[in-house]
Every structure is written in structure tokens, then in C-alpha cells.
Amino acid sequence: MVKTGRDAGLPKPDSDDPTSPVYWGHILEPIVAEQYSQQTGRKVRRVNAVLQHPDPEKHWMLANLDYSVVTDDDVQILECKTAGEFGSRLWKEGVPDYIQCQVQHQLAVTGKQAADVCVLLCGQELKIYRIERNEELIEALYVLE
């Protein structure tokens, strides 16, 4: 919605407001990444760049990664999430669809094969989900985006 301008009438999340979930997600992201490393033994590195799809016909596809997983053949991307009392309901049956699409978009831009999504639910339960590259979904995203 941001890319198309359809978000113009919607309220904007305030990352400086300590009552906002966005604020807490930003504060807790490094802690979630550290806990992921401790639980999996995988090393992660913060990605401080906007990545662009290498195909000139898809140059409009950009991605912001939270972390890259280094020296691991099974997984290359780490997406960190937090969810409070209400947001955690979306995670009852696994990774919500909108997060699945976000991660498939990241895999499309980077050419990577798999990502882990690490979510802190209600500030005390950490869950890790593996998302493998799905070419059919990526092709659908190309059309939709």
C-alpha cells in the first residue's frame, strides 16, 4: 500500500511512541536476533542496506533484511518479529500469510533459498519457523507487485 500511495488515509505507526508496537518491535529486534543465535547456534549479521533485485527487468524490487545468517548452507536470512497479546493470535497456525509474502519477496530479491522467521510472542515465548523459497508464490508476487 505504501508503494501505490493507497496508505495515504491510514494512520502512520509512530516508532518514537513507547505505546506503539512498532516502537517495541524496533527495540526488541536485536534481542530476538541474539536469542535466535543462542538457540540455533547460527551466527547472524545485521544488514544495513536496501537490496535491489539483480535482474534489470525487476530493478523495482527492493528488500530490507533484518539479518543475514552467515556460514550456514540451510538458511541465509533471519526475519525478526514481535507480537503482543492481540498480534500473537495471528501466529497460532504458523507464520501469517503477510509475513510469508514478505519473506518470499526477500528471497526473490536476494536469490537466497531459505529464511528463518524468529518471533517473540507476548514478550516471553520465542518461536522459529523455516520458510523455503517457493517459486510459484514468487512468480505470483512478480505479477501482483
Question: Where would I find each of the regions flagged by the language model?
Answer:
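Charged, glycine-rich intrinsically disordered N-terminal tails and low-complexity linkers that flank
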Residues: 1-27
